[in-house]
């Protein structure tokens, strides 16, 4: 981390993502860049050296804690504490971590094959050696030894020898890559064992400080950016349908049901007038005149159903002999649908009483 600006940021992000991926943690590049910019703002002395040790990283943690106390925890990125804890564990396992060296020495199998092809095709030209690591040095040395006597042979033998030499080089490169993969695998196993056997007691910070840092890390943990074990999908059950109690019957059916409950069936029979009376006093049913019905309908629409004139017309209609069916038909013909529903409801309630 001896360079600054965009180059230093790219190196830091690349190295940090590779170290975390080796531990099975995948962090987004945007989160790593945000963490790097946060460290630059919090710690004025970071980064200054090519290597990073545990003491410097603990100092960065103290500065993060002080920054959170001054500006509040909302000003700290969500992934700051988890990344800080993971890198602290890495530095605990190995005292000094040379990040730039680890980045420069990471040679992939594709790079080795490209270097081998370039050496075989340019055997008659000037040879140039890079600083790619020990793997390229071994390949260049073998190519120099074999190229000394290639051109002394006839053309056919030379072509045949070139093919054999190319196969030998490919086998050697594969062996080198295999040795590198084996060493990486052993190193990962060693790091895992060291991680499991790590002593979490620390003398530089008090137990309260470490607890505070770990609580903040758990508080700012985000499953969308730091992918941990997959959660099982919870299947929600459909809510059971509510069963409502059926409403009691209304109207004549309601009256019959109430009479059956109370054991009184007198209202189920028609009313019969008993006694002596003149024929003139016997009520005679006549249909409601159409003129009276129109007058009542006009009064309801123009003045309202509760206007004094409307009530006078209703009293005139009530002076005649009307059956319940006549009243229902009259109300339906003169009132609006809403007023008719209200009238019928009140009529049924009064009938029950």
Curated annotation (Swiss-Prot):
InterPro entries (alphabetical): B_retro_matrix, B_retro_matrix_sf, Primate_lentivir_Gag_pol-like, Retrov_capsid_N, Retrovr_matrix
Domain of life: Viruses
Lipidated sites in chain (N-myristoyl glycine): 2
Pfam family, any one: Gag_p10
Keywords assigned by UniProt, alphabetized: Capsid protein, DNA-binding, Host-virus interaction, Lipoprotein, Myristate, Nucleotide-binding, Phosphoprotein, Viral budding, Viral budding via the host ESCRT complexes, Viral matrix protein, Viral nucleoprotein, Viral release from host cell, Virion
Bias (Basic and acidic residues) ranges: 151-169, 178-192
Motif (PTAP/PSAP motif): 305-308
A biological process term (GO) from this entry: viral budding via host ESCRT complex
Region described as Disordered: 151-192
PTM per Swiss-Prot/TrEMBL: p10 is myristoylated.
GO molecular function ontology, one term from the record: nucleotide binding
GO cellular component, one term: viral nucleocapsid
Biological role: Nucleocapsid protein p14: Nucleocapsid protein. Binds to single-stranded DNA.
Stored PANTHER family: ENDOGENOUS RETROVIRUS GROUP K MEMBER 24 GAG POLYPROTEIN-RELATED, IGE-BINDING PROTEIN
Domain characteristics, as noted in the entry: Late-budding domains (L domains) are short sequence motifs essential for viral particle budding. They recruit proteins of the host ESCRT machinery (Endosomal Sorting Complex Required for Transport) or ESCRT-associated proteins. Gag-p27 contains one L domain: a PTAP/PSAP motif, which interacts with the UEV domain of TSG101 (Potential).
This protein's name: Gag polyprotein
Organism this protein belongs to: Mouse mammary tumor virus (strain GR) (MMTV)
